[in-house]
Amino acid sequence: MVNADRGPIVVLRSSAGDHLVRYTRALQQLSEISIGRHAVIGGFAVMVRLATAHRVTEDLDAVTWTEDGTPEAPIALLLEHGATRSRNGVDLGGVHIDLIAVSDYVPTQLPDDVDDAMFVITHSYSLASATWLTIEARATSDNLASRATARVATPAALVAMKLRAMQQRRANALNKRASDAYDVYRLLAAHDRDGSIARELATAPDGVGAWCVTRARDVFDTNAGQTRRWLATGSPDMAAVSVDDLRTVGTIFADALEDLLRD
């Protein structure tokens, strides 16, 4: 299905006890407040791109453009519309929204640390490449419970951000590493069968593609056993992913992307 004004329609089935209806409602509230250009990223964006609630997520994440590269201006505007200030963002409609701000950057002025630079590059890329979707969250009765229209990061941009995120997780955030790895695995399995993610990242700016090749080989091949141990600490679906599964999707993706970058 396609909404002529706001792109394809994605339907999420909301089972008892999950937060999809509430998250979608909060996302629509966010979209109706003119905070400027922004896009949905993070775990909820992955769910939308997979069209399934494949895991639990604790909040909504959004990237937004601001002139000074801080989220203070959009946060102030959201507070004026009834939100309350919270860690790294706001609470809106009972949902925590983590706001990450980006601004225009000059590549020569990026941080010397590659992973720090990739935080800026991948989040800026996710905002620039995001596409409009209409998201419908349906309750167990199958009645339409909430609808939102929003720009959502592409599967390729989500893979790049997640590869970077798991590199920087603290040692006590093993559950986050497991979630990041599972998100990338599911996105590659669902959207890179025809090389779509590899093709998009081959055209990404400022070395994103080559960096993703290196990270994917590390996470899904060289250290696939470690990644498997992360997943074993998660849900039954995460724990069911084998080392061979990881190596298959990761190697196909990395090989295809590397070949494209050589052309």
Placement of each model-derived feature along the sequence:
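Compositionally biased terminal segments of proteins
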Residues: 1-263
